[in-house]
Amino acid sequence: MAALIAENFRFLSLFFKSKDVMIFNGLVALGTVGSQELFTVVAFHCPCSPARNYLYGLAAIGVPALALFLIGVILNNHTWNLVAECQYRRTKNCSAAPNFLLLSSIVGRAAVAPVTWSVISLLRGEAYVCALSEFVNPHSLMVGERSFPVAHATEILARFPCGEGPANLSVFREEVSRRLKYESQLFGWLLIGVVAILVFLTKCLKHYCSPLSYRQEAYWAQYRANEDQLFQRTAEVHSRVLAANNVRRFFGFVALDKDDEELVAKFPVEGTQPRLQWNAITGVYLYRENQGLPLYSRLHKWAQGVVGNGMTPDHVEMSLLPS
């Protein structure tokens, strides 16, 4: 049963790795929507106090969005490739345009969750109403022939998000809520439209500027996914066998289960890779060609024995970043 569950998880992992990044972004967005709903129900409580409402409302929208953005940057492998590039090569082998494109890719992916959070917050309107209720102009509030009392208007308006205030002003409370939710939802829909246009233009520009055909880009994406999967799996086995060998040398024996015994017997490990090899396969990578043949990754480049960035006429570097 455990093996079946593990196999199913492996299949799902391979499925999502083989598909377009839009699937992953969709899952991130759905998870963010659920988190936002839970936050609104459990944790959001407007203080309904002048000066505090504004800070609390902005914090309810901005702080989780900022946290989600930073988490997205941290979890993106391209971030650490860029850091490694700066550390080992000082980005001297990459022009400004590729570095900017890679940074844009990192920011774009990391922005999925915070943008989703902001959009849902604006469409719901609670945080916006909480933040701006006290700033509604009391002179603009008219219901029939009744006008809103100006005395202590700020304090009364600040209490409206909590459903509080004088009973005879409940009709104004509904008007304030309706007006602010209209503004909040309008900003939310505008944000959706702006993001959709930016995504569309970015995708069009990426494919227009790409030197590769659509099929070769798809093949490159499949290669990267397969290389990463095989590298991680092999690194896990290599480190496990190496650890078993070192423990055996120290104690004279090593306690292995059946699976580990098969691994040690099947994959003998003689040594480790030097640091220079690890550095060679780590960092920012652009699509390159060597004598007309594509090099799809730093590992591919290292395996082919290509040294440097290939700036001779027989080498072609293309400023195309992975999706």
Swiss-Prot record:
Segments on the Extracellular face: 44-52, 133-179
Cytoplasmic-side segments: 1-21, 77-101, 207-323
Pfam family, one: Ca_hom_mod
Residue span of region Central pore: 14-39
Coiled-coil annotated spans: none
Region forming the signal peptide: none
Keywords annotated in UniProt: Cell membrane, Disulfide bond, Ion channel, Ion transport, Membrane, Transmembrane, Transmembrane helix, Transport
Main location class: membrane
Swiss-Prot/TrEMBL catalytic activity: ATP(in) = ATP(out)
Record field: transmembrane: 22-43, 53-76, 102-132, 180-206
Region (Intersubunit interaction): 214-251
InterPro entries: CALHM (IPR029569)
GO cellular component, one term: plasma membrane
Gene Ontology molecular function terms on file: monoatomic cation channel activity
Family: Belongs to the CALHM family.
Subunit structure as annotated in this protein's UniProt entry: Homo-undecamer. Two undecameric hemichannels can assemble in a head-to-head manner to form a gap junction.
PANTHER family for this protein: CALCIUM HOMEOSTASIS MODULATOR PROTEIN, CALCIUM HOMEOSTASIS MODULATOR PROTEIN 2
Role summary: Pore-forming subunit of Ca(2+) homeostasis modulator channels. Mediates ATP release from astrocytes and ATP-induced Ca(2+) influx in microglia thus regulating neuronal ATP and Ca(2+) homeostasis, synaptic transmission and neuroinflammatory response. May form intercellular gap junctions. The gating mechanism remains unknown.
Protein name (Swiss-Prot/TrEMBL): Calcium homeostasis modulator protein 2
Species this protein is from: Bos taurus
Name of the encoding gene: CALHM2
